[in-house]
């Protein structure tokens, strides 16, 4: 199958999926996410390495697509995004994120849906949605909490601050920081591809288990904030490259 927004390369038991949008920061449209899901789920049971071309893994969702969304449309967007992230997280073979540049917002949530994360040293991470008057809507609140605990997850999400690959490793968000991040990810994928498939599938299922209902309130909350005027102000301020003037603070 041919793709518009990603590149796919198969190497034995490994598939390398590269996000390659026209923008150098690889913003995630829903079409891009659908292509990533298709490339992962139809990889012929290969171990997958997911990375980004150009300057970033992904700087997040395409904010232009948020303009004009109401609560119902936002809930539908969150629901499809959740379905895609859950499909990647639930893929029975390991998925390794090779991250560089930026992993912001939906790009960070995409990385969190992977099983292992290997980062280049100068990579920056953030869930900055709070600064747009919204919140992470593709599983980020729950997957981050699962990794770092409630206190750290709350601080990261409520401030929207950026943090380094080194801090991400200290917080156990990333497994490894390496200048050779992509080569290391592919080498690890090749190693995992040699492991017994059924045992590895069950290990992943048990270690990664999260009840489905933990994501329901996040989707509902994502829809709620899109009906608030602060969301419209936050998105408009972002697009106009100015500080937002939130009413409800």
Predicted feature locations:
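Acidic, divalent-metal-coordinating active-site segment for phosphoryl/phosphodiester hydrolysis
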Residues: 161-167
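C-terminal long alpha-helix characteristic of the crotonase
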Residues: 22, 34, 118-123, 171-219, ...
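CoA-thioester-processing core
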Residues: 84, 88-90, 98, 104-158, ...
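Conserved CoA-thioester-binding segment of acyl-CoA-metabolizing enzymes
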Residues: 1-53, 86
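Structural motif
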Residues: 51, 98-99
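Glycine- (often His-adjacent) and acidic-residue-rich active-site loop
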Residues: 52-87, 103
């Amino acid at each position: 199958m041919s793709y518009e927004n990603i590149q796919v390369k198969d190497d034995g038991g490994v598939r390398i999926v590269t996000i390659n949008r026209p923008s150098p920061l690889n913003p995630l449209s829903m079409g891009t996410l659908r292509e990533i899901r298709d490339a992962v789920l139809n990889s012929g049971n290969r171990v997958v390495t997911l990375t980004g071309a150009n300057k970033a893994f992904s700087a997040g969702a395409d904010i232009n697509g948020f303009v004009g969304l109401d609560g119902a449309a936002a809930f539908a967007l969150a629901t499809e995004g959740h379905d895609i992230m859950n499909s990647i997280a639930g893929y029975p073979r390991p998925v390794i994120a090779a991250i560089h540049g930026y992993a912001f917002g939906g790009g960070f949530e995409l990385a969190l849906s992977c099983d292992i994360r290997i980062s280049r040293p100068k990579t920056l991470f953030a869930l900055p949605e709070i600064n747009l008057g919204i919140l992470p809507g593709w599983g980020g609140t729950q997957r981050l909490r699962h990794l770092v605990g409630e206190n750290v997850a709350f601080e990261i999400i409520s401030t929207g601050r950026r943090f380094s690959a080194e801090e991400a490793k200290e917080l156990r968000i990333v497994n490894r920081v390496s200048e050779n991040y992509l080569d290391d990810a592919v080498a690890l994928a090749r190693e995992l591809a040699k492991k017994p498939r059924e045992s590895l599938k069950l290990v992943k299922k048990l270690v990664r288990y999260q009840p489905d209902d933990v994501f329901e309130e996040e989707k509902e909350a994502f829809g709620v904030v899109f009906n608030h005027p602060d969301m419209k102000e936050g998105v408009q301020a972002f697009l106009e490259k100015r500080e937002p003037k939130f009413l409800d603070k």
